[in-house]
Structure formats: C-alpha cells, structure tokens
Design a protein with these regions (language model features):
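Active-site-proximal substrate-binding core of FAD-dependent oxidoreductases
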Residues: 43-46, 219, 288-301
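C-terminal segments that line or cap access tunnels to active or ligand-binding sites in enzymes
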Residues: 112-224
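A conserved FAD-binding loop/helix module that cradles the flavin
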Residues: 265-288
C-alpha cells in the first residue's frame, strides 16, 4: 500500500466517506432493496448447515435465500452464530487471535481557519518522541502512554464542502490499546484527560486552534465496541500479521454455513477503505445473482 500511495497518490472521494455511503444506498434502493437504519440483528438463522435468514433484536425474523454479514467476523461468529455449530471459527480460536490496535479519534471543527496553518495539509503525520517502545505499549502491554503519534486529517483543504465557508474540519487519530488486554483502559475516566493530551500536541502544530473550536466529538475503543460491535474495540478487526492477512482471514465465503458471506475489514483482503471496498467487489463476483423471478418482479415494479 505504501508503494501504491507513493506511486499513484491518495484518492479522496469528494463529499467524504458519507458521499460513498450515500451512493451505495442509492444503488441498493434503485435495485428495489430496503435499508433499515437503527435495526439490530440478534442472530443469523442456520438450518441444515445453511443460512436461512436473520432474527432482529425485536424478535422479527426475515427469511432469505442467503445472508451477507458486514459485521466484524468476530461478532458474526461469536454472537450472530452463537447457537450454530462451528468447525473453524470457534470461540476459543477467535479469542486466541491477535486483534488490531484501538483508536482514539477526536473530530472537531474550527471557525475562520481556512487560511491558517498552511503547512497542515489534507494528511499530516505527527511522530512522537518514541517509536518501538510506544508500539510495545499499544500492542503488547496494553498501556496508555502520555506520549503519542498522531495522524491529522484536514479534508476541508481539498473539499471545501465539508465545512462552512472559511472554516475547517479535522480529526486527530491516535493508536491506543484495544480493550482485550488484562487491565483495559477505562475510557469513561480517561477520555477527557487523553483529549487534553492530544490537544497539547496539536497546539504545537496549529497554535491557537483550541480557541477556534466550534464543535467536537470523540471516539474511543469503547465507542468502536458499542457502536460498531468491534471485538475489544479494535479499530481494524484482526491484526494484519502474516498468518492473519489476506487468505488467512475469515473467508468471504463462510467456512461455517452455506449461503453465508462476509464483507468488510475483517475478511479478505483486509482493513482500510480500499480493502473494504475491494472485499465488496470480491463479493460481487461470489454471491449468486438474485433469482430470475425476483429480478422480473423488480423490473415490473
């Protein structure tokens, strides 16, 4: 990926990730699909070794000839398929996997700053004083250190539509331990303190930015766990080690049930927007087309 970014540059979808999601939603609806927002799936129904639909948190059952899960494979197998026998992705195997780091993400908007800090572009990496020791704290020890390395995203320098005229949109991302360590970070007590530490680092890069903040929102590993059902609040699903990458990740065609397919960061080929979109393209080649009768019905409508 490093070579591709250096050789061909970094692509940005105007309007941001929301524009991509909106475009996908339009395609689904144009094909007669329905999107139910704010709806939890409690389990995937498995009958005779095949996926036959889902049961929602309300108890409603939706029958289907096949099921595609874009939940993290850890959640799909440990929770959504908790009542079904599994041969490969049992709870013990999933618990023994190495999960990626957690993320502390601070989103904020600033007023009247578009012409300020000209050295801060769309993408900025701010390296901390330590490298290998910080990685050990994050990945091995589960220790939340006071020092950090940050990625700063300022999309408004490329896409003015993401902020009011003259203003800016930012997020600052810091790698932090996930919640699966022996003594996980209690973010209910640490969130505001860590936000202040991040602000102190950013102040060196963008003097005076704190006085211009108009809105803000913070995500912690607890947010990723509760909002996105990510195991241990990990930011990128399974850690992309050699034996947890590409083909060694849970397969797009589930090994546990016929008619069950996986898509997203935790499956092949991996995490990140390019990886997730690629997994959808892979699935487009693997999932059978809708039966002709259903297609004719949609055309008639």
């Amino acid at each position: 990926m490093g070579f591709l970014e250096k050789q061909y540059g970094v692509h940005y979808a105007m309007g941001g990730v929301q524009a991509m999601a909106d475009a996908m939603a339009r395609i689904v609806r144009a094909q007669g699909g329905e999107i139910r927002l704010g709806t939890d799936v409690d389990r995937i129904e498995i009958e005779g070794g095949a996926a036959r639909g889902v049961t929602l948190g309300t108890g409603q059952r939706l029958a289907a000839p096949l099921v595609v899960s874009n939940a993290d494979p850890g959640h799909t197998y440990r929770h959504l398929m908790r009542a079904a026998p599994r041969k490969r992705w049992r709870d013990k195997r999933l618990k023994g996997r190495r999960w990626s780091m957690g993320l502390f993400v601070w989103y904020f908007g600033t007023k009247g700053t578009r012409e300020m800090w000209p050295d801060v572009g769309h993408h900025t990496i701010l390296s901390g004083p330590r490298y290998a020791p910080l990685l050990k704290d994050v990945f091995l020890k589960g220790h939340l250190a006071d020092d950090m390395s940050l990625y700063i995203h300022r999309p408004s320098v490329t896409d003015p539509s993401v902020a009011p005229e003259g203003d800016d949109t930012f997020y600052a991302l810091s790698p932090v331990p996930h919640l699966g360590h022996a003594d996980p970070v209690d973010w209910s007590t640490m969130q505001h303190r860590y936000r202040d530490l991040v602000a102190g680092e950013l102040e060196r890069l963008m003097p005076g930015f704190r006085d211009r903040i108009t809105t803000e929102l913070t995500f912690t590993p607890e947010t990723f766990r509760d909002r996105y059902l990510s195991p241990y609040g990990s930011g990128f699903s399974l850690e992309p080690r050699i034996l947890q990458s590409a083909w060694f990740r849970p397969h797009n065609v589930s090994e546990e049930a016929r008619g069950l397919y996986l898509v997203g960061a935790g499956t092949h080929p991996g995490a990140g927007v390019p990886g997730v979109i690629s997994s959808a393209e892979v699935l487009g080649q693997l999932v059978p087309d809708a039966p002709a009768r259903a297609a004719q019905g949609l055309a008639a409508e």
